[in-house]
Amino acid sequence: MDETTERPTVSFSYSNWISNIKKSTREAYEAKPFSHWILLFFSGAAMLIAFPASSLLSRLYFSNGGKSKWIISWVAVAGWPITCLILLPTYIFQKIKPTPLNTKLVLSYVVLGFLSAADNLMYAYAYAYLPASTSSLLASSSLAFSALFGYLIVKNPLNASVINSIVVITGAMAIIALDSSSDRYSYISNSQYFAGFFWDIMGSALHGLIFALSELLFVKLLGRRSFHVALEQQVMVSLTAFAFTTIGMVVSNDFQGMSHEAKSFKGGESLYTQVLVWSAVTFQLGVLGATAVLFLASTVMAGVLNAVRVPITSVAAVILMHDPMSGFKILSLVLTFWGFSSYIYGSSSSNSSTQASSSSS
């Protein structure tokens, strides 16, 4: 009797969840104009193309003779005028005024800019010492850190599915660490490999903290969600991160060293310039696409696209840069997908229960 009553309950719960997803998808499609979905499509495409391209270009910089972590960190935020150029028409044509600055808002931008500069520097160490496919898999742990810091700082719900995703993604990172012997480049020492591993995880943790603090900034200080406000935040944070990274470039004399580095770069000065310019463009387009997806859709949608770009980067790195792809790394990739799926399921379940409670009240 117990078994016969249990199975239909589980089946019903799963099918009910699927039907709710279909219903909410249909309602969302009918509620928005066609232009909304076109913009969302191009924003998602920007994430899925620009972020993997940026990762591969960063790795190409180091594999072809680039040495400076500061240069690749500086390039990551040097494309901030691109977002500024997209923001300006909203002021001109929509007659929208810029958000007034106050002391708390300026301090928030400075703190987030400093953290972003530090985050980019940590990831630069990862790109210097790790294959692009490995650094991409490790960077996916930022989702677990985002969930954890979101719970601690923004008080976002942390249900069993989200906790499961944190545990699974952590296990995937441990598997990569165990496979260091087959994953490490011959010219990279053990200490350099584990330094890249460490800074990739630290960068992912800091990225999760930045995400939570950015969400808190929207909730506490900006007080409203609109696209131009999201663009303003991105411009100001990128600008302050650019300022901090420029100071680092000046102190380390890397501006003077760029000409010498370009001459010794494998492929010549032209390729060196192209790698740096396109790194700046692709990274900023990826960030802009992610900002648009967060505004047009949801955090869950951004998480889905973030999950999809991990295998895209890994497969592209194996094909284009001949990264090693062992059985351990494939297992880690599968576990990462599992963790992402669990997170997405937990987030959608929380959103559904929140909407149900608000509608009933």
Swiss-Prot record:
One CC-aspect GO term: membrane
Topology of this chain in the membrane: Multi-pass membrane protein
All copies of domain EamA, residue ranges: 75-178
Organism ancestry: Eukaryota, Viridiplantae, Streptophyta, Embryophyta, Tracheophyta
Transmembrane segments: 37-57, 70-90, 105-125, 134-154, 158-178, 193-213, 235-255, 285-305, 315-335
One Pfam assignment: PUNUT
Gene Ontology molecular function: purine nucleobase transmembrane transporter activity; purine nucleoside transmembrane transporter activity
Gene name for this UniProt entry: PUP5
Highest rank taxon of the organism: Eukaryota
Biological processes, Gene Ontology terms: purine nucleobase transport
Protein's UniProt keywords contain Repeat: no
Compartments, record wording: Membrane
Keyword presence, Ribonucleoprotein: no
Family classification: Belongs to the purine permeases (TC 2.A.7.14) family.
Protein name: Probable purine permease 5
Principal subcellular localization: membrane
Keywords: Membrane, Transmembrane, Transmembrane helix, Transport
